């Protein structure tokens, strides 16, 4: 499994890393996956620091500030709420599609 955050304008995004940390934490706790990379360790630490209050934790992030200026606080809160959908995209022939299984 490769987790790749999209970032913003070719730059690191804190919320992408926290999301990757949440996914990595779930996968690794299943004991079906292993990781020996420092990036997954760092992402998991960020996730565990933020998981009790994503909205507050990301208050200083550049992306949240940008979206707040666009009056999108409600959207931000929705995006920071885990397990909002059961749809999982998959990659097929260089396209993202909805999983059929």
Tell what function each PLM region has.
Residues 3-7:
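Short, structured patches in soluble enzyme cores that scaffold and shape functional sites
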Residues 9-11:
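Short gly/pro/ser/thr-enriched loop/turn and capping motifs at secondary-structure boundaries
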Residues 14-101:
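Long, charged alpha-helical interface segments
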């Amino acid at each position: 499994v490769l987790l790749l955050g999209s970032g913003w304008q070719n730059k690191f995004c804190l919320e992408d890393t926290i999301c990757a940390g949440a996914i990595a934490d779930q996968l690794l706790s299943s004991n079906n996956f292993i990781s020996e990379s420092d990036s997954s360790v760092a992402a998991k630490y960020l996730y565990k620091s933020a998981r009790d209050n994503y909205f507050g934790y990301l208050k200083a992030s550049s992306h949240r500030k940008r979206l707040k200026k666009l009056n999108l606080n409600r959207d931000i809160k929705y995006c920071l709420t885990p397990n909002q959908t059961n749809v999982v995209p998959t990659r097929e022939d260089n396209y993202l599609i909805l999983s059929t299984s």
